[in-house]
Amino acid sequence: MRAFLLTLLAATLTAVTATAQEWAQVTTPTAGPTQSIGFYTAGCLQGAQALPLDGPGYEAIRVSRNRYWGQPVTIDFITTLSEKVRAAGQAPLYIGDIGQPRGGPAPSGHASHQIGLDADIWFERQPGPRLAPAQRENPRLRSLVRADDGGIDDSVFTQQHATLLRLAAEMPHLDRIFVNKWIKQRLCQTVTGNRAWLRKLVVWIGHDEHFHVRLYCPPGNPQCQPQAGYYADDGCGEPLDLWFTRPPVTMPPPDAPRQPYRPKLPAACAAVLTAP
């Protein structure tokens, strides 16, 4: 019994402190019912579901990363939004990272996307034929923000981008959408009529080439930790102004040395990482 307990403890500690690279090396999901365990930036995913790489109104990109796994509610969100976008006469969406087969920290690109309830959707579209597999790894992905970070790039931004964000913000199960400060500002300045959906747009650094949807913890996932609320109104006042008055937040260059990302995960993630 003592040997068994020591083995179990060792496995638990390994999973809880495992590096992002160790999570990325697991290429398949676990069996069993889908469960989001932990928080968006420190958790894992049991029983993940794969997004089909092609569907009506969308195609997945950068699929070699193997980050097209998520909660069923996330997969349904993407496919339903894509159908709405297609019905609105827009070109198919590029779907980026959702999560790894068992969630957990990723070795590049994200601190979140760990419990299957986050997804990146790119502002760039492909109005023509679907991309060949090789093209999906590095498609053109233009920013909606000027290169000098001085405002919206009006040669790229169109009303279709505003419509896309509104359609996403009005979807059920959506907690928030992370967007760049300039995008939020433009919409705050131009949207008329029903502005309630603007509340869902939460400013964060980057997010000028894509927007990041985050869904609520689904019912029946008791180990999923919800995120605190945000704006009481549309978020177009002081919360937005602060992004333009406080010192700018800068990201390190892509080639900067990085410490292995090792968030403290829930103990239950041990079984997720080590399951067959």
Spans of features found by a protein language model:
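Extracellular/periplasmic catalytic domains that process cell-envelope and extracellular macromolecules
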Residues: 86-88, 112-117, 169, 204-207
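Acidic/His-rich structured neighborhood in mature extracellular/periplasmic domains
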Residues: 100-154
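Active-site acidic/histidine clusters and adjacent loop/turn architecture
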Residues: 30-96, 156-166, 171
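Catalytic cores and adjacent binding grooves of peptidoglycan-active enzymes
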Residues: 135-276
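Positively charged n-region of N-terminal signal peptides that target proteins for export
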Residues: 1-4
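Bacterial N-terminal signal peptides
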Residues: 6-15
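Sec/Tat signal peptide C-region and signal peptidase I cleavage site
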Residues: 16-20
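Extended, low-complexity, intrinsically disordered C-terminal regulatory tails
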Residues: 23-26, 77-108, 178-200
